[in-house]
From Swiss-Prot:
One of the primary rRNA binding proteins, it binds specifically to the 5'-end of 16S ribosomal RNA. Also plays a role in translational accuracy; neamine-resistant ribosomes show reduced neamine-induced misreading in vitro. Part of the 30S ribosomal subunit. It comes from the Bacteria. One of its GO terms (molecular function) is zinc ion binding. The strain missing both S17 and L29 grows very slowly and has a rather unstable temperature-sensitive phenotype. GO terms for cellular component: cytoplasm; cytosolic small ribosomal subunit. Coiled coil: none annotated. This is Small ribosomal subunit protein uS17. PROSITE patterns: RIBOSOMAL_S17.
Length: 84
């Protein structure tokens, strides 16, 4: 059994909560009948201890123990700040 920690990259879509952000993860899924690749989005609640992220930032997150009912991911680093 491997204990590999999952890490993902996504874009911040909300930062209105205190010490929390919502990150959208985009992935492509092949349609089972037609074969076309469709874009699917998953929104994850992420713990941001220092409130350093803003809307539009590209961030790297990793899985952790459950911190609340919906938060089980934590911020690793900000890959790219949003251009305003």
């Amino acid at each position: 059994m491997t204990d590999k920690i999952r890490t993902l990259q996504g874009r911040v879509v909300s930062d209105k909560m205190e010490k929390s952000i919502v990150v959208a993860i985009e992935r492509f899924v092949k349609h089972p009948i037609y074969g076309k690749f469709i874009k699917r989005t998953t929104k994850l609640h992420v713990h941001d201890e220092n409130n350093e992220c803003g809307i539009g930032d590209v961030v790297e997150i990793r899985e952790c123990r459950p911190l609340s009912k919906t938060k089980s991911w934590t911020l690793v680093r900000v890959v790219e700040k949003a251009v305003l």
